[in-house]
């Protein structure tokens, strides 16, 4: 389905002309329509949140698979940098024996996430926090799709000109948030735990090195997306 067909499907005929005008101005079709499908659920999106991508659906799918093989009890999950809430809400819906918390530094993003929580009849606990600053318990699963684009990296204009830079860019060649999370994560993990990251396709080995630096007694797995690009890091803590 191309963008015009997408507009025709989701917009009222009276709004179609204005929608096409915005499309020609370079505004993403998802922001024009105001929602996006993710893992079979519908999420409201606007310029305060990142538009969920297929790769993030893959992150969720792989994480669900690892959780089902790794835990036999009710689990506590934390989503760091939740944005629209798509990861947290999907995990809450798909993993019945779970309690899901989700945080973001952006209050505007949290407003959207809480709306999506209601619309999808999920029970995620959303709270405002700069990484772990307001987190106060331990988790079995910590998942994050943090900002990972380096400031000097070229990206498409439609992304750069519309999506929130706070959700896109990171210092330290895009590695800042991985470093901060991994540096501080130990005190928020239960004895048996999983960390799941979406990453930039050139960052895999560097993030593996960070895992070895901060969490030396864990197993780390680098996985590719459907485009055969390095895209996901999974860390398994067994004790």
Regions found by a protein language model. Give the residues of each.
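Auxiliary N-terminal substrate/complex-recognition segments of SAM-dependent methyltransferases
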Residues: 1-239
């Amino acid at each position: 389905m191309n963008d015009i067909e997408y507009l025709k499907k989701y917009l009222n005929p009276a709004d179609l002309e204005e929608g096409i005008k915005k499309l020609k101005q370079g505004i993403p079709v998802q922001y024009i329509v105001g929602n996006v499908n993710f893992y079979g659920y519908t999420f409201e999106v606007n310029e305060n949140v990142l538009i969920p991508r297929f790769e993030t659906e893959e992150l969720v799918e792989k994480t669900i698979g690892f959780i089902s093989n790794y835990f036999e009890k009710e689990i506590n999950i934390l989503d760091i940098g939740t944005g629209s809430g798509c990861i947290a809400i999907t995990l809450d819906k798909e993993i019945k024996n779970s309690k899901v918390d989700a945080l973001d530094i952006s209050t505007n993003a949290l407003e959207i996430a809480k709306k999506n929580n209601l619309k999808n009849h999920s029970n995620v606990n959303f709270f405002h926090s700069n990484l772990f600053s307001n987190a106060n318990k331990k988790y079995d699963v910590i998942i994050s799709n943090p900002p990972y684009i380096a400031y000097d990296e070229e990206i498409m204009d439609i992304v750069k000109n519309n999506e929130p830079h706070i959700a896109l860019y990171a210092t330290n060649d895009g590695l800042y948030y991985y470093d901060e999370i991994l540096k501080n994560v130990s005190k928020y993990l239960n004895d048996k735990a999983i960390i799941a990251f979406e990453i930039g396709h050139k960052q895999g080995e560097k993030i593996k090195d960070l895992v070895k630096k901060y969490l030396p007694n864990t197993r780390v797995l680098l996985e590719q997306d459907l485009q055969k690009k390095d895209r996901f890091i999974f860390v398994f803590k067994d004790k």
